[in-house]
From Swiss-Prot:
Species this chain originates from: Schizosaccharomyces pombe (strain 972 / ATCC 24843)
Catalysed reactions, as listed in the record: a 1-acyl-sn-glycero-3-phosphate + an acyl-CoA = a 1,2-diacyl-sn-glycero-3-phosphate + CoA
EC identifiers of the protein: 2.3.1.51
Function: Acyl-CoA-dependent lysophosphatidic acid acyltransferase with preference for oleoyl-CoA. Involved in triacylglyceride homeostasis and lipid droplet formation. Involved in vacuolar protein sorting.
UniProt keyword annotations, A-Z: Acyltransferase, Endoplasmic reticulum, Golgi apparatus, Lipid droplet, Lipid metabolism, Membrane, Phospholipid metabolism, Transferase, Transmembrane, Transmembrane helix
SUPFAM superfamilies in UniProt: Glycerol-3-phosphate (1)-acyltransferase
Membrane topology recorded in Swiss-Prot or TrEMBL: Single-pass membrane protein
Main location: other
Residue stretches spanning the membrane: 32-52
Family: Belongs to the 1-acyl-sn-glycerol-3-phosphate acyltransferase family.
Gene Ontology process terms (BP): lipid storage; triglyceride biosynthetic process
InterPro entries, alphabetized: Plipid/glycerol_acylTrfase
Record-given protein name: Putative lysophosphatidic acid:oleoyl-CoA acyltransferase
Chain location of the short sequence motif HXXXXD motif per the record: 115-120
C-alpha cells in the first residue's frame, strides 16, 4: 500500500481516488447463476434505454423546450428508467432540517452535490428540472453543460472536459430562474469513491450575495458503482456484476446564503460533510489529475 501514500489524506488516511472493487462470490454458487441471469436481462435493457435517452436528449428535447413541464416529465422518466436498468431498485430521499416560509427549492436556486458516479447525473435529472454547470479549479466561473455531456464526461479524465463560455455563478443562476430550472454544481470538480469530500473549487465565490445554495448528498450502497477512476469498462463491469444497489439522498432544507456566511465555500463543505456523515480531506482536483496521470503511466 506504500505506492498509494501520496494520494492518501495525511489527516484521515482516506484515499478518495482509489476504486472500490465489486465483491464477487467465491467459487461457483447460486449467486453466480443469479448474476448471469440478471446480466443477460440487463444488457439489452441498458442498450435500449441508453439509446432512447440519447435520441431524446439530442433530437427531441430541443423541440419540446417550449413545453418545459412535458420535457421535464420525459427527462425524469427516462432517467428513472436508466437507473432501474442499471440496477437501482431503491431510491430514498430524506430531508435534514425543516423548511421555513419561502425556503423551499425554487427555480434559480443552486444545489451543491457531492460527486462519486456518472449515476449522479441521472439521479438529479430524475428528481429536478436541472441546469448542470462545470466547475473550474482555477476560477470561480462555471460553464453550462447538458446532462448527457456531463454523464459521458465521467468516463474520461477531468482534464479533457474543457471549460467554455464560462460565466459567474450568479449569471447562470439568473438564467436558470428564467427558464424554470435549478443549477446543479459538483463543487469538488472531480469524481471520488464516496469515502470523503475533497476540497471545493472556488465556484461559490461568483455567486450573488442573495443566491440560495442547498447542499445535497448522494450515497450508493454498495459503493462499487462509484467511479473515481474514469473507465467505461470498469463502470459496465461494476453494474453488470452488481445484482442491485440502493441510492440514498440527504437534502438540507435550510439554504446557505452568501451574505449570511463568513466563507460560503467552507460552510457548504461543512454542511455537505454532515449530511453524508463523511470526512473532508485536504486533497483536491489537482491531486486527482496527478493521480490519474501517474496511474496512466503505471506509477500506481
Amino acid at each position: 500500500m506504500e505506492k498509494f501514500t501520496r494520494w492518501r489524506d495525511p489527516g484521515t488516511g482516506i484515499a478518495p481516488f482509489h476504486p472500490i472493487n465489486t465483491e464477487t462470490p467465491s467459487g461457483f454458487n447460486f449467486k453466480w447463476i443469479l448474476i448471469v441471469v440478471v446480466m443477460i436481462l440487463r444488457v439489452p435493457l441498458c442498450i435500449i434505454s441508453v439509446t432512447l435517452w440519447f435520441l431524446w436528449s439530442c433530437f427531441l428535447k430541443p423541440i419540446l423546450s417550449i413545453q418545459p413541464k412535458l420535457s421535464f416529465f420525459i427527462d425524469s422518466s427516462l432517467s428513472r428508467l436508466l437507473l432501474l436498468c442499471f440496477g437501482c431498485l431503491k431510491l430514498s430521499k430524506s430531508t435534514s432540517g425543516s423548511f421555513v416560509q419561502g425556503d423551499s427549492l425554487q427555480p434559480g436556486d443552486i444545489l451543491a452535490v457531492n460527486h462519486s458516479s456518472p449515476l449522479d447525473v441521472l439521479v438529479l435529472s430524475c428528481l429536478y428540472n436541472c441546469t448542470f454547470a462545470v466547475c473550474d479549479s482555477k476560477t470561480s466561473n462555471v460553464s453550462i453543460i447538458s446532462a448527457q455531456a456531463y454523464f459521458w464526461s465521467c468516463f474520461f479524465s477531468p482534464s479533457k472536459l474543457k471549460i467554455t463560455d464560462a460565466k459567474p455563478l450568479a449569471k447562470v443562476a439568473a438564467k436558470a430562474s428564467k427558464i424554470g430550472t435549478v443549477v446543479i454544481l459538483f463543487p469538488e470538480g472531480v469524481c471520488t469513491n464516496g469515502r470523503a469530500l475533497c476540497q471545493f473549487t472556488p465556484c461559490f465565490d461568483s455567486a450573488k450575495e442573495t443566491d440560495r445554495i442547498f447542499p445535497l448528498y448522494i450515497k450508493y450502497l454498495p459503493p462499487c458503482v462509484t467511479l473515481p477512476v474514469p473507465s467505461l469498462l470498469s463502470f459496465a463491469r461494476s453494474v453488470l456484476l452488481t445484482v442491485s444497489f440502493e441510492i440514498r439522498i440527504r437534502f438540507s432544507a435550510e439554504p446557505l446564503i452568501p451574505r449570511n456566511c463568513t466563507d460560503v465555500t467552507e460552510s457548504a463543505q461543512e454542511v455537505l460533510s454532515k449530511l453524508g456523515r463523511s470526512r473532508v480531506v485536504k486533497l483536491g482536483k489537482s491531486d486527482k489529475l496527478s493521480y490519474l496521470d501517474a496511474r496512466s503511466k503505471k506509477h500506481v
